[in-house]
């Protein structure tokens, strides 16, 4: 980020953070506990953040990564969302990249070279890739601004989203004790938060729990009767011109529903695990841009 180097180091951390928020991300002010979290992590301390989806979790590590020397390493199990985040950051002028199984060898090598040369502000990486000896050895030679562990509830062995690799992320504290860490989740009760803190060695981290009141979100339950007609009416009458996601219970249902909507003049794309990576990436990109 070219503009950050011109900020006077005599400015307070809060002023610098607000400058980045406004000039890079385009928001006039922080919301809720964002400013406090950003201050904490940017000053080199650890945090555990529980915040609803859409509550601004990403800014809590993106801004500290831009304020601190080096590259922020973001651990995420959601490969599809990595591309979204990197594309959105690139449009803002932030030097971001990702490493995951969707890339071919040449793409991964280009990203690794950029990291080694200090050309990245943020690197999104899947936990299984991060935990390889090769990757950890590479990080030993890199200036790391922070570690952000997204979807931190995946460390809980009692949760539906348990990922065994997440338990091994305690190595980040052991191997890089001077690098601040921020663990983030939108799904964790008090017991799960304690488990996250224990397994990731974040017992001393400051915990932030945001309100989950989301007045802009509502559930509507409709009795099933001629499902396709109901879906069509819902889209045309309540969400004409909007973008949306239709969840189905099987891959075949995804394909059938996509075909039906297109036949009705509603542009729709399929997305499921049975599709090749290139097609999923292309459909995801089109959904975000068209």
Residue ranges and their predicted role:
Residues 2-5:
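Residue-identity detector for glycine
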Residues 7-11, 15-24, 28-32, 36-48, ...:
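Helicase motor core with emphasis on the C-terminal RecA-like subdomain
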């Amino acid at each position: 980020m070219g503009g950050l180097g011109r900020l006077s180091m005599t400015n307070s951390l809060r002023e610098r953070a607000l400058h980045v928020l406004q000039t890079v991300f385009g928001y006039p002010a922080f919301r809720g506990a964002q400013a406090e979290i950003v201050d904490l992590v940017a000053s080199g301390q650890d945090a555990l953040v529980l915040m609803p989806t859409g509550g601004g979790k990403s800014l809590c590590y993106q801004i500290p990564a831009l304020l601190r020397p080096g590259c922020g390493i973001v651990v995420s199990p959601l490969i599809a969302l990595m591309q979204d985040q990197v594309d959105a950051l690139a449009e803002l002028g932030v030097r971001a990249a990702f490493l995951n199984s969707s890339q071919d060898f040449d793409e991964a090598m280009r990203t690794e070279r950029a990291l080694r040369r200090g050309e990245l502000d943020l690197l999104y990486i899947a936990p299984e890739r991060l935990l390889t000896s090769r990757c950890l050895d590479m990080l030993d030679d890199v200036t790391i601004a922070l570690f952000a562990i997204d979807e931190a509830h995946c460390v809980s062995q009692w949760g539906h989203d348990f990922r065994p690799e997440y338990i091994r992320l305690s190595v980040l504290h052991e191997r890089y004790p001077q690098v601040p860490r921020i663990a983030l989740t939108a799904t964790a009760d008090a017991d799960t938060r304690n488990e996250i803190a224990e397994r990731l060695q974040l017992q001393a981290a400051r915990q932030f729990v945001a309100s989950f009141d989301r007045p802009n979100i509502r559930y509507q339950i409709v009795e099933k009767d001629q499902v396709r007609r109901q879906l069509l009416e819902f889209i045309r009458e309540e969400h004409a011109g909007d973008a949306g996601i239709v969840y189905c219970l099987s891959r075949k249902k995804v394909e059938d529903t996509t075909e039906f909507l297109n036949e009705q003049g509603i542009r729709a794309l399929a997305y499921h695990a049975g599709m090749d990576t290139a097609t999923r990436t292309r459909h995801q990109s089109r959904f975000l841009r068209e």
